């Protein structure tokens, strides 16, 4: 009972002059423009629109004719190219296709390919008159019937090397071969698909009652699309026209048709195209539409009066809604104050704006952390199920200004921490990355583009770059590397992804960069890896590995020659950096070398986990970026601890004995050498010698002799032409036993091994 007087008072307050004025104003806005537009369309524009539609139809016909001419031209060009293909046509007259299956297959394949590439072709075939008449259609078929042979030979009597010919109800394109010869010995024949041509002709007259024709030089119908009775009348009217091209109007069955016709030059022939469209179908929709507009306007006037009344009642509702939003629980306070609605809204707006600014300042302080967190989750594909619009919205919320920018992912890898020029040392990795981040941000600010940097550890940072134009991004990378090197003495490897306009593709770019950075050269110098560029095909070959150096390194480690092992490892790293070149190949080689050394460690009875202090050597290898660093890691982490452990387990006399035995094996491996003979020569027990030899080398005496003999046999098989029997005798084996032991050790007989390596370029 208390709310009813307030409801009445509120309604009577806004239904006054403001309501009436707005009612009349809205009614005028709704009615007058529509009446003026409808009248202008109906009384002034019908004639112009009809002419414009007619011109538009003629333009469409010309455009579709041009497309049809282009498609036929492409067909002719494809046939000509095949006729002048020297790899197929040279010597074709002398080839016996019945016996030369390879060449017949190539011709048949070419015909299939030509038919598949050209949708206009229904059938492609080749007729050869010599050395024996035959047809490839595209299957091989000899011509024995004289009537068929006479029909095909008549194709060769044309004065033109390429021409169109009507064959029954089908049009064929004929190319004589060879194209430039006076006496052709064959022809390539393409039969045009009538259904495809009907589809093309349909575009000349897309109206339901329209028709389109394509006539040859004798004005006979080649292709048609439409009603046959109408086409006969249309053809009769075309033949009466004195001009070669133009347009006219004709009447048929109470309908007026607009007819356009013209000529097309097709290989020394003049074809005629005809397009007929009902004029009523072109212009009637506009007349009908204008009448509909007038009727609708009359109806709309009545509706406008009702809707204007309803809309005017709704005009005050936005103000009422705003008051509800801004007043909240203070509605009674506003009513008691008697203040104007808009002034009250203005006051509340200012209060809310002040609160909003405070919240924005707090948000700005958290924005860098939000950006890094979002970028980290984005790169890790944590937003896999989010769509593009959602990700863009979240990025803009996090503080990025995306706009029309394109995205690049850039990986910056710092190298040279052990270099003499470096101002940093081990343990300063975070400081080096911090310096790089500052220089990158300052340089980006000067070049006016956005970037976000994420430290992913191991002296590497990932950068998300946003630019409207990526043309100067390489210049930025070059300048960044130069400034960073001048300040720190370190080198920088930059891996640049391809560009994308989609946020959802950024994780894929990050994965590409992670894989692509392994293409860097294994050297301490500034490098730029642009994943948009094509890389040399050489990188697809098998990576290089110095097997001989590996043997020498392992042997020197077995003999505990630390300095010699260091020199060999330095040489190996230098050779790998020059020949294996890129990171992933060098890392694979390092893993192989490490595994070989670890095998010896296991043979010696040591536990690699305890020796390496439970660290992950393979992870360490993946982080090596330069030869000096790799050599130092092998010596410091692998060789030196291993040799230190061995010093307390082996005595010098055993090593000297092993060295003397190894020397004897290398000198006498081709003879009947045995452990007993070596023990007799050294004046000691064979059991003691065997135990000492295995403790030093990691393998027993027989296996070592077998290994030396097999390696020598491999060298003789690959580098000489000696018989396998002679090779077996030179390495100290009988022929039959040599084959068995070689296959057991290598996995294949010696003959197969020689053939495989001699065939390898």
UniProtKB/Swiss-Prot annotation:
Domain HTH araC/xylS-type: from-to ranges: 659-756
Residue ranges of DNA binding: 676-697
InterPro entries recorded: Homeodomain-like_sf (IPR009057), HTH_AraC (IPR018060), HTH_AraC-typ_CS (IPR018062)
Major subcellular site: membrane
Disulfide topology: none
Segments on the Extracellular face: 44-285
Gene Ontology CC: plasma membrane
Keywords associated with the record: Cell membrane, DNA-binding, Membrane, Transcription, Transcription regulation, Transmembrane, Transmembrane helix
Induction of synthesis: By rhamnogalacturonan type I (RG-I), a component of pectin from the plant cell wall.
One function term, GO molecular function aspect: DNA-binding transcription factor activity
Gene3D superfamilies linked to this entry: Homeodomain-like, PAS domain
Segments traversing the membrane: 23-43, 286-306
Annotated compartments: Cell membrane
Sequence ranges on the Cytoplasmic membrane side: 1-22, 307-761
Pfam family, one: HTH_18
Membrane topology: Multi-pass membrane protein
Functional description taken from the UniProt entry: Probable transcription factor regulating the pathway responsible for rhamnogalacturonan depolymerization.
Protein name: HTH-type transcriptional regulator YesS
Species name: Bacillus subtilis (strain 168)
Phylogenetic classification of the source organism: Bacteria, Bacillati, Bacillota, Bacilli, Bacillales
Gene transcribed to yield this protein: yesS
